[in-house]
UniProtKB/Swiss-Prot annotation:
Gene name in the database record: E4
Keyword Phosphoprotein applies: yes
Upper taxonomic lineage: Viruses, Monodnaviria, Shotokuvirae, Cossaviricota, Papovaviricetes
Pfam families: Pap_E4
Protein name: Protein E4
Keyword Aminoacyl-tRNA synthetase applies: no
Species the sequence originates in: Human papillomavirus type 18
Length: 88
């Protein structure tokens, strides 16, 4: 830090050209930086979709075999089609 006894105009002679310059009593501290925002993933909600077709589902229960198949098809407002098939 600068020595408080030395006038600032000695260190910076061009400041003496200003008539109304006065040395501030102390520096204003810099504000604390904000934490960066965490990126959030946008969830696709049901009302974001134009149509949802979940009619094609099948359940088979045999004595030696059990399976579940779920087929979902959705079309977005932009016309993109998404198909999800889940087989268990």
């Amino acid at each position: 830090m600068a020595d408080p006894e030395v006038p600032v105009t000695t260190r910076y002679p061009l400041l003496s050209l200003l008539n109304s310059y006065s040395t501030p009593p102390h520096r204003i501290p810099a504000p604390c930086p904000w934490a960066p925002q965490r990126p959030t993933a946008r969830r696709r909600l049901l009302h974001d979709l134009d149509t949802v077709d979940s009619r094609r589902s099948s359940i088979v229960d045999l004595s030696t075999h059990f399976s579940v198949q779920l087929h979902l098809q959705a079309t977005t407002k932009d016309g993109n089609s998404v198909v999800v098939t889940l087989r268990l």
